[in-house]
């Protein structure tokens, strides 16, 4: 018994030092307990992504024995290349490498895609937890990780929730530039996302957030308190950790209040920066919620054939033009996987005139 206890104590001898190192805020880069999970997951995802982007063989994404190539070695470039989603034949099944009969089968069915996205999602979730952990150690408020939850929610929406709703990981977003655009086009064709209010909020958040960031940065830069001569860089007028303000918020407030109107300008630096954080974050949250609802086919608004004249005849509108564009994109994607999309097979088509008749 004494021998066993001595062996256990020798094995755990370095444990307190390891715990101290992991949770120390004096390290150049904070590790943290979430970092212990984050680091191997993100490294695994990055390594598999790079190898698959360079050398993965074609993947039977639609499950119809028509493999789609996405790697450099099979003719793609940085724009057209992607890690192709796992096969529709796999569906929502968890498909680790040991579930396949051979490595060739695993590659053919798109196994690397699942490996990358699962490790990536765990890694970014752990990164968010690590942000909270470091804030806690330093006695800071926890809002950094709350803000980061917006892009995390977006990643979970397109890589996990949407495939769950559609019934197959083959419907997830490909890991590449043109693959992302293809995902966007197909999403518009099948769900009319551009007409979804939550997506509109996300667009407002991205463009509005960029506008507010540019406005804030330019106002601050334009109202710096002079500390240098004309021949020196104005950046030398600031010393890291100085107590006094480096710009005149009263001047910035006065300028913007006169440029627009008084109450359009913040007179409180804290409320200003809270707004700069909360506006894009809430809008991206809404977009993620929109993706999650459309995953289960609660789609954007459509105004197809919504205007009729006194005789009941349909008056074509831009809503019908948009619907025609959606149908065009829908018939072009996965063109060999089905003969007719459900939208086209369900009812009689309605002619929409897009050109004026000849006169004379």
Swiss-Prot record:
GO function term, MF aspect, one: chlorophyll binding
Record-linked PROSITE patterns: REACTION_CENTER (PS00244)
Post-translational modification: Tyr-162 forms a radical intermediate that is referred to as redox-active TyrZ, YZ or Y-Z. C-terminally processed by CtpA; processing is essential to allow assembly of the oxygen-evolving complex and thus photosynthetic growth.
GO cellular component: photosystem II; plasma membrane-derived thylakoid membrane
One Pfam family, short name: Photo_RC
Residues reported to bind chlorophyll a PD1: 199
Entries under InterPro entries matching the protein: D1/D2 (IPR055266), Photo_II_D1/D2_sf (IPR036854), Photo_RC_L/M (IPR000484), Photo_RC_L/M_CS (IPR055265), PSII_D1 (IPR005867)
Compartments it resides in: Cellular thylakoid membrane
Keywords noted in UniProt: Calcium, Chlorophyll, Chromophore, Electron transport, Herbicide resistance, Iron, Magnesium, Manganese, Membrane, Metal-binding, Oxidoreductase, Photosynthesis, Photosystem II, Thylakoid, Transmembrane, Transmembrane helix, Transport
Catalysed reactions listed for this entry: 2 a plastoquinone + 4 hnu + 2 H2O = 2 a plastoquinol + O2
Cofactor note: The D1/D2 heterodimer binds P680, chlorophylls that are the primary electron donor of PSII, and subsequent electron acceptors. It shares a non-heme iron and each subunit binds pheophytin, quinone, additional chlorophylls, carotenoids and lipids. D1 provides most of the ligands for the Mn4-Ca-O5 cluster of the oxygen-evolving complex (OEC). There is also a Cl(-1) ion associated with D1 and D2, which is required for oxygen evolution. The PSII complex binds additional chlorophylls, carotenoids and specific lipids.
Superkingdom of origin: Bacteria
Chain positions of site Tyrosine radical intermediate: 162
Additional record remark: Cyanobacteria usually contain more than 2 copies of the psbA gene. 2 of the reaction center chlorophylls (ChlD1 and ChlD2) are entirely coordinated by water.
Biological role: Photosystem II (PSII) is a light-driven water:plastoquinone oxidoreductase that uses light energy to abstract electrons from H(2)O, generating O(2) and a proton gradient subsequently used for ATP formation. It consists of a core antenna complex that captures photons, and an electron transfer chain that converts photonic excitation into a charge separation. The D1/D2 (PsbA/PsbD) reaction center heterodimer binds P680, the primary electron donor of PSII as well as several subsequent electron acceptors.
Protein's name in the database: Photosystem II protein D1
Source species of the chain: Prochlorococcus marinus (strain MIT 9301)
